[in-house]
Amino acid sequence: MSICTSYDIELWKIIQQETIRQEEHIELIASENYVSTQVMKAQGSQLTNKYAEGYPGKRYYGGCEYVDMIEQLGINRAKELFSADYANIQPHSGSQANFSVYNALLHPGDTILSMHLNHGGHLTHGSQVNFSGKLYNAVFYGVDENGCINYEKVHHLAVKHRPKMIVGGFSAYSGIINWSNLRQIADAVQAYLFIDMAHITGLVAAGIYPNPLPHAHVVTATTHKTLAGPRGGLILASGGNDALYKKLDASVFPGSQGGPLMHVIAAKAIALKEAMDPSFKVYQQKIVQNAKIMVKEFALREFKIISGMTHNHLFLLDLRDKNITGKDASTALERANIIVNKNSIPNDFRSPFITSGIRIGTPAITRRNFNENDVRKLSHWICDILNHIDNNEIIFSIKNKVLRICSQYPIYNKSY
C-alpha cells in the first residue's frame, strides 16, 4: 500500500477514508465480515499475474506448477473441512457458483422450487430480476405465521409442480433448516436437492449448524460472510457421483468462467486453514450467542422479531408496529455509525427499496471481540434510535458512544 500512497494519492485517500469508516462504524450487515491480514496478503500477491484456465494437472496454459499446488491445497482443505469428496474452489462468487449448479443440472424452462426472496431466500433462487428467474420456472415456498418453514406445504408444492430441483438455503432466515426433510421431499418427486449455504458456511464448518452435505446432491457456499475469508464461492458435494462432479466442473470452466483468480484461490485456502483452528469454533459459537442476546434485548424493548428467535448469525426486525420503514431505520442508524441493511419481511407490502424491516447479523462485531455486555448496550442503542428516529440529540449521543467502543476494538490493530 505504501507504493499506492505515493503513486496515486487520489485513490489512496479514498481507500483511507473507507478504512477509517470501517474502524469507526459498527458493522451489523449479516453478509459482511473482516478478513485476516494473511488473507489480504495472499489476495494482493503476485498470483494475480497468473492465468490458469482449466484445473490442476489439466491447464490450457504453461507455467502452472505452483498454482496447481495452491489450488489443490485449497480443494483438499475444503473437502476436509466440510466432509466432502468433491470441491470446486474456482467460482468468483456465490452467485457464480449457483449459476454453475443450475447450468450443470437443468435446462432452460425447468421448474425449481425455492424459498421466496421476501421470505428469506436469495435473488439467485428464482427472482424474476435474476438469471435464475429468467431462465427457469420458479415456484416458491415461504414461512408460516410463526416465521418457520412448513415442510408439509413444501411437499404439497413439490407434488403439485414436480420441480426438477428443490433449492434450500437463505439470506434472511433465522431458523435451522431440516435438510433431511427437504431431501425426502426431493426424493419423492425425483428432484435434485441443491443447498445454498452461503450465509452459514462458517457455522457449518464449525459444526454449529447442521451440515447439508449428507443430504444434498450439491451444495454451494461463499468464503466471506461467516467464514471470514475473501469474497468468493465454492461448490461441494459428497456421495461419489463422478458423473455429477464432471458436470459441475465443466459448468464452472469452460461453462461460465474463464481463468480462475489464483490470488483469490490462495486467499480462500488460507481462510479454510483458519477455519480448521479450534479458535474458529469458539468464534462461531460466540456469533450465535451474540445474535441470541440481541434478540432477547430487542424483545425486552418490545420490538418484533420475525420467528421470535434466532439459531444462527442473523435475525429480522419487523418495524411495522413502530410505523418505521426499513429504509428510514437504516438511515437513522447510519447517522450514529451503526450499519444494518433494510430488508423485506414475509408478506411485505413495501418495495425492496423501502421495506418494512431490517436485517441484523453478528459475524463482524463478534470478529471484533465485542463481549456480551457490549452487545447488550448496542442492542439498546439501536432501540433508542428506532424509538426516537428524528431525535438528533439522541442519535448524536449514541454516535459518540459508538466511536468510543470502536476505538476499544480496532479491527486491524494499527494506526491510520
From Swiss-Prot:
One of its GO terms (molecular function) is pyridoxal phosphate binding. It is found in: Cytoplasm. Its main location: cytoplasm. Keywords: Amino-acid biosynthesis, Cytoplasm, One-carbon metabolism, Pyridoxal phosphate, Transferase. Its cofactor is pyridoxal 5'-phosphate. The modification N6-(pyridoxal phosphate)lysine is found at K225. It comes from the Bacteria. It is an enzyme of class 2 (transferase). Homodimer. This is Serine hydroxymethyltransferase.
